[in-house]
């Protein structure tokens, strides 16, 4: 029997009560990178934040933010 793939998205977050998830996406992206800075790139503790932002954020945004982080122009508090 084949393994089933379970699809999940980020859980509801009281800080983001509306259907527009832009801030939720941005916050989860920042939380992930803060976590990896504090605990290291390979930390399993950070994986949940990665899952959340990957589920919420459009890929184009993530690509742009990654480029900005690499060039030192990312607008968020990392």
From Swiss-Prot:
Specifically expressed in roots. Keywords: Disulfide bond, Mitochondrion. Residues 22-65 form the CHCH domain. Disulfide bonds join 25-57, 35-46. It holds the Pfam family COX6B. Its main location: mitochondrion. This protein is one of the nuclear-coded polypeptide chains of cytochrome c oxidase, the terminal oxidase in mitochondrial electron transport. This protein may be one of the heme-binding subunits of the oxidase. The keyword Mitochondrion applies. This is Cytochrome c oxidase subunit 6b-2. A motif (Cx10C motif) lies at residues 46-57. SUPFAM superfamilies: Cytochrome c oxidase subunit h. Belongs to the cytochrome c oxidase subunit 6B (TC 3.D.4.8) family. It comes from Arabidopsis thaliana (Mouse-ear cress). One of its GO terms (cellular component) is respiratory chain complex IV. A motif (Cx9C motif) lies at residues 25-35. InterPro entries: COX6B-like (IPR048280), CX6/COA6-like_sf (IPR036549), Cyt_c_oxidase_su6B (IPR003213). Coiled coil: none annotated. It is found in: Mitochondrion.
């Amino acid at each position: 029997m084949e393994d089933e793939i379970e699809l999940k998205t980020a859980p509801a977050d009281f800080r983001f009560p509306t259907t527009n998830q832009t801030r939720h996406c941005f916050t989860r992206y920042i939380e992930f990178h803060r976590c990896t800075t504090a605990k290291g790139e390979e930390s399993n503790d950070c994986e949940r934040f990665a899952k959340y932002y990957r589920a919420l954020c459009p890929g184009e945004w993530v690509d742009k933010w990654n480029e900005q982080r690499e060039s030192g122009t990312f607008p968020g508090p990392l």
